[in-house]
A protein has these predicted regions:
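Nucleotide-activated sugar donor-binding and catalytic core shared by glycosyltransferases
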Residues: 1-156
């Protein structure tokens, strides 16, 4: 089955996560393991809709695209993926998500303007100015799980 594209409607849940994860250009052969760790953590979420945007066309981007496709095909009831959401749909979607998860600059730049939590995974956005709504973590299962728990805790 093909991935649902931008014409399909997002079925929002009580909890919603937007995932945008790109390979890190200067890190060779790390994208697959890092993204598998993210998928492991996302799989632990209950009653949560996961909205993926496809990665850019960096060297290991096709690996991540395949992992997303496989995940969505196995988890149709709780996930959807977009090759491109377009600016309007992307910004409109931010209104309904609890967090942006991944390593995209939009989590650092746009999300804080909307007062949306960002889980920034790894070093892709290293040394960028960040708002108070950004949680940084290593691309490791336990750290990602801890960051996701923090998003839904009353402390954050």
């Amino acid at each position: 089955m093909n991935i649902k594209m931008t014409k399909n409607l997002i079925k929002f849940s009580n909890k919603n996560i937007l995932v945008t994860f790109h390979p890190v250009t200067l890190e060779v052969d790390t994208a697959k393991k890092q993204f598998e760790n993210l998928l492991y953590a996302l799989d632990k979420l209950k009653d949560t809709q996961i909205i993926f945007t496809m990665p850019n066309s960096d060297t290991e981007g096709r690996i991540i695209q395949k992992l997303i496709t496989n995940y969505v095909n196995k988890n149709k009831f709780k996930s959807i993926a977009y090759t491109s959401m377009g600016q309007k749909r992307y910004l409109s979607t931010l209104k309904y998500v609890d967090a942006i998860v991944g390593n995209s600059s939009s989590g650092i730049l746009e999300a804080p303007s909307f007062k949306i939590v960002t889980i920034n995974i790894g070093d892709r956005q290293k040394n960028r100015v960040q708002g108070k709504t950004v949680i940084n973590c290593r691309p490791e299962k336990k750290q990602i799980l801890n960051a996701l728990e923090k998003v839904y805790s009353k402390k954050f």
